[in-house]
C-alpha cells in the first residue's frame, strides 16, 4: 500500500504522444480571430487605443490584457456570453490521482462549446475515460496520451452514461483535503470493473479530430524567447478555440491560501502562504509535491503585486480551473504567474528538478486538440447492476437525458451559435404542440359555423 510520497504524474511527457502545433493550425486560428465577434471584443476592450487594428493576429497589442472563458464581462458580444455560460465548472477528484483525465475531458468538452458544436454543457465523464483509456487510473497518467487514445478509440461519453459516484459517494475516496491524493493509497480498485453505462440508454459520443497538438514542450528545453512567443500563441489559441490542458510542478506552498493574498496569484517562492502575515519570499524553502494537470481558461495581469521581499511589479498570469473542488482556491479556480516570474511551477518552459528522493523529474507543457464534428447519439454497453454504486450523484432520470438533447444547426443563429443553454425535445413537448394546434383548428371551425 502506497501511503507516503506518492509522486503522481512525476514525469509527464507530452512530447512523444503529440504532434507539433503547425503553421496550418496557426493560420486557422488567425482566421477565426478575424471574425466579427472577436473584432468586437477587441475594439470594445481597447476603445480609443487600438481601435484601428483589424484582427488579433496582426499584433500582440491587439490581444485583450485580460480574458478567460469563465468570467462574463461587459465587453463580451452575445455569442461569447452564450458560450461562457456552458463552460464546465470545477470538479473534485478527491483521493483519486486522476487530474490527468479529469482536466482533459473537461477541456475537450469546453472546446465543443467554443466550436459551437453543442448547445448544452457537455459534462464529459472522467470515469468513462478512465475505464476505456485507463493508463494508471487513480495512480496518474498522461493527458496527451489520453487525447491520442480518444482520437483513435470510441471517443468520450458524458456523465449521463456514467458519473463519478463511485468516488464522490464513497467514504474511501471522498475527502476535504484537496492535496490528499498525493499521499493516499491508489484508489483505482474502487472503479467499476466493466466498461459501459449505468443504464440502457443512448448517449452522445464526442470525438476529437486528430492527435493532440503540443504548444510547448516539443523537443529540448525552451529558450526564453520561445517561451514568450508561446505565451502569445497560447493566448490566441485559447481565445479562438477554447481552454487548453497544462502540466506543471506542484510545491508544498500550492495551497488554497495563496488565492486570498497578493492579488491572488501563485508565486512559487513565497514561504508563508496562509500565515496571516504579509507574504515573504524564500527561493529555497518549498519542497516538490508532484506534478499536476489543469485546464487553462485564460490569462490576465495582476497590477503592482509583491514579487520579492523588496520589489513590486505587474505580473502576468494564467487563469486556470483546478480539479480539487469548489471549496479550494477561488471557488475552484486559481491564477498562476507566467514565466519568468515562476521559473519552475509554470506551463511553457520545460524544467527538470531533483526531488527529495534524488530522482530527476521533468515537466511542463501545454496540449490542445481540435474538434469539428457534432456528437453522435448511439447505444453503449451497460455495466452489470452489481457494478452500479449504491448511492448515485443524480436521479435515475439523469442517466437517460442524452436522448432528449437536440443539436441545432449553427445557421439558425445569426451569431453562429445555438440559442439557449440546453435544448430538449420530449414527448410532452410534442403533446403540447398538438393540443395547441387542435385548439386552433376547433376555434377556426367554430368561427366559420
From Swiss-Prot:
Organism field: Invertebrate iridescent virus 6 (IIV-6)
Protein keywords: Hydrolase, Membrane, Protease, Thiol protease, Transmembrane, Transmembrane helix
Role summary: Probable cysteine protease.
Active site feature: 99, 292, 322
InterPro entries for the chain: Papain-like_cys_pep_sf, Pept_cys_AS, Peptidase_C1A, Peptidase_C1A_C
GO biological process, one term: proteolysis
SUPFAM superfamilies: Cysteine proteinases
Name listed for the protein in its UniProt record: Probable cysteine proteinase 224L
Intracellular or extracellular location(s): Membrane
